[in-house]
Swiss-Prot record:
GO terms for biological process: brain morphogenesis; cellular response to oxidative stress; gamete generation; germ cell development; interstrand cross-link repair; myeloid cell homeostasis; neuronal stem cell population maintenance; nucleotide-excision repair. Belongs to the multisubunit FA complex composed of FANCA, FANCB, FANCC, FANCE, FANCF, FANCG, FANCL/PHF9 and FANCM. This complex may also include HSP70. Interacts with ZBTB32. Upon IFNG induction, interacts with STAT1. Interacts with CDK1. Interacts with EIF2AK2. It is found in: Nucleus; Cytoplasm. The lineage of its organism: Eukaryota, Metazoa, Chordata, Craniata, Vertebrata. DNA repair protein that may operate in a postreplication repair or a cell cycle checkpoint function. May be implicated in interstrand DNA cross-link repair and in the maintenance of normal chromosome stability. Upon IFNG induction, may facilitate STAT1 activation by recruiting STAT1 to IFNGR1. It comes from Mus musculus. This is Fanconi anemia group C protein homolog. GO terms for cellular component: cytoplasm; Fanconi anaemia nuclear complex.
């Protein structure tokens, strides 16, 4: 104990010198030095309080004669008091110095001096602590009398000055100097989480000067962004947009923060994704094309790095849907042309894809689908003839709007015509195997057409069984044609089971209990865009095993069922949604 007290006495002298140096100067370097050493000073105060609370006032002053000076300097340093922990410990330490039963005028004078320090601290900053009531009542006042009038008035004054400076525009005499703006933003770094500072933080974020360089400190942007992402402060949309527009690292960190939330679960849940995306403010901010382009590029990078993982595709599509909704809410007439958001795709294609496919009446869906297929095909074939556009760009634009794929599958399986439209076949083959050349894509379309004809023939020929589905999806032995993408085959079979009365009868057997299908083969793999594609793809096949026994496949089915529920309002009847919900619960219980 004695050794610890001696060490703290030495530390007290060192910190007193440091506080005196901070007090004598208000330069940028001093502010940075204060912020740098705040955590160490907090730890010192914490250790000091543990000693002081066991001692009486006389013993404290005898052991630590300069403790009063140190605490007084701390009380007048706004950077120290900006932290809740520092505020609380300073008050506790001051309370320890109070003489409970003053017997001399010197002791009464000390108590009066300490009351003055406490009064300053409590009037300058807002506290929501039980200790405040105790301290203020001991001074003979109610806590309401110490509401933060001083800080509030200072903030309001600065906000008014910023607004006046902003309105004066190019008037250099009335405009706040860039150096002062920088200094003010640096001072605010440790204060951004204080509720009374919110108006000043918002005013700084939305202030736009006429200087060629940024006038606010990057540390200010980082502190505000960190506080916003950790939900310690609430900002209006305009302030958030300004923050991310002016400070690219903050936008990147916010996007990565969203990715961590979206991809933390192995199970895809689109409604949870939508909730996270809306709460992130990124769709609203992405109404600014510059912000959207950064977020979109980060999605592109993750999509490539994960080989087109289903959860990344799903997140991209939900984000795009939220963006389109935000654009319509912001202005019925788009402020920016769609080509500004998707500069690498054909403008007419972006306009066609941005429509809501679910809103199209059931009898009028084929023509928009065929139009999109034609536009995509022209763009892709134009790429092969030497156009500067990359085929990947057309595919990347297409996958933003996944609802059209659902619509294409529904049109193929639920139409009464004998021959499936070639445009829909091309659309699905391109979505699931974008890396294929035109000749290989034509072969896959033939294979897909054969599969769909077999499935539709089964529906017309009588009661359906899981074995029938199994046989219909198998390619004839020795067939040299390349198989249709396994992911696409599974999607067709599951859609057939959910969207037709014949499928309802066997869906439980096919998916959870009875013989079902495990299809191997390439899925949607964007990495092939930048690597060598294998010359021979494995044959898609069906085997009599339970689909639920393969983790990758069961997760794919869960994702498909969740997607069906998410987008099924105009695509499925109520019975299909009920089946999807029940199957989803059953499969989720197995993982």
């Amino acid at each position: 104990m004695a050794q610890e007290s001696a060490d703290l006495a030495s530390d007290c002298q060192s910190w007193l010198q440091k506080l005196s140096a901070w007090e004598q100067a208000s330069s940028e370097e001093t502010q940075k030095d204060t912020c740098l050493h705040l955590s160490g000073f907090q730890e010192f105060l914490r250790q000091m309080y543990e000693i002081l609370k066991e001692m009486d006032s006389d013993a404290i002053l005898e052991r630590f004669p300069t403790i009063g000076q140190l605490l007084a300097k701390a009380c007048w340093n706004p950077l120290i008091l900006a932290y809740d922990e520092s505020q609380k410990i300073v008050i506790w330490c001051l309370c320890c110095l109070m003489n409970k039963e003053p017997r001399t005028s010197a002791e009464s004078g000390l108590n009066s001096w300490i009351r003055g320090l406490l009064s300053h601290v409590l009037s300058a900053f807002r506290f929501d602590m039980k200790e405040v009531c105790l301290f203020t009542k001991s001074l003979g006042y109610e806590s309401i009398d110490y509401y933060p009038s001083l800080l509030k008035n200072m903030v309001l004054s600065l906000v008014s000055e910023l607004r006046e400076s902003h309105l004066n525009g190019l008037s250099t005499q009335s405009r706040m100097a860039p150096e002062r703006m920088m200094s003010l933003s640096e001072v605010c770094v440790p204060l951004v989480t204080l509720p009374d500072m919110e108006p000043l933080v918002e005013a700084l974020l939305t202030y736009h000067g006429h200087e060629p360089q940024e006038v606010l400190a990057p540390e200010f942007f980082e502190a505000v962004n960190e506080a916003f992402l950790s939900e310690k402060i609430v900002l209006p949309t305009s302030s958030v947009v300004s923050l991310w527009f002016r400070h690219l690292p903050s936008l990147e960190k916010a996007t990565l923060h969203l990715f961590e939330k979206l991809f933390s679960s192995k199970i895809i849940c689109l409604r949870r994704m939508e909730c996270c995306i809306r709460e992130s403010f990124l769709p609203q901010a992405a109404c600014q094309p510059a912000i959207f382009r950064i977020v979109d590029e980060m999605f592109r990078f993750v999509l490539l790095e994960t080989d087109g993982a289903p959860e990344v595709l799903a997140a991209l599509q939900v984000f795009t849907s939220c963006l389109v909704e935000a654009l319509k809410k912001e202005n019925k007439q788009l402020t920016f042309a769609l080509r500004t958001y998707f500069p690498y795709g054909a403008p007419c294609l972006a306009a066609a894809l941005s429509q809501h496919p679910e809103a199209i009446p059931q009898g009028h869906r084929l023509q928009p689908l065929l139009h999109i297929s034609q536009l995509l095909r022209e763009a892709v074939e134009d790429c092969t003839r030497g156009s500067p556009r990359n085929p990947f760009e057309s595919w990347f634009l297409f996958v933003h709007f996944g609802g059209w794929v659902d619509l294409a599958v529904a049109e193929l399986l639920l139409r009464e015509e004998a021959e499936p439209p070639a445009g829909l076949l091309w659309l699905l083959v391109f979505y699931y195997s974008p890396q294929d050349g035109s000749q290989q894509r034509e072969q896959s379309m033939v294979e897909l057409k054969v599969l769909i004809n077999r499935l539709l023939m089964l529906l017309r020929s009588g009661p359906l069984s899981a074995t029938d589905l199994q046989e219909a999806a198998e390619s004839p032995s020795g067939d040299p044609r390349p198989p249709v993408c396994g992911q696409l085959v599974r999607r067709l079979l599951l859609s057939l089971l959910l969207w037709t009365p014949e499928g309802h009868a066997i869906v439980w057997e096919a998916v959870t209990h009875g013989p079902t299908f495990e299809i191997t083969g390439p899925g949607c793999c964007p990495r092939i865009w930048r690597s060598t594609r294998p010359q021979h793809r494995p044959r898609a096949h069906l085997c009599c095993t339970e689909m639920a026994h393969t983790d990758a496949v069961i997760h794919e089915i869960i994702g498909f069922l969740d997607q069906t529920l998410y987008r099924s309002q105009h695509l499925c009847v109520e019975a299909s949604r009920k089946l999807a919900r029940d199957l989803l619960k059953e499969l989720q219980a197995q993982v």
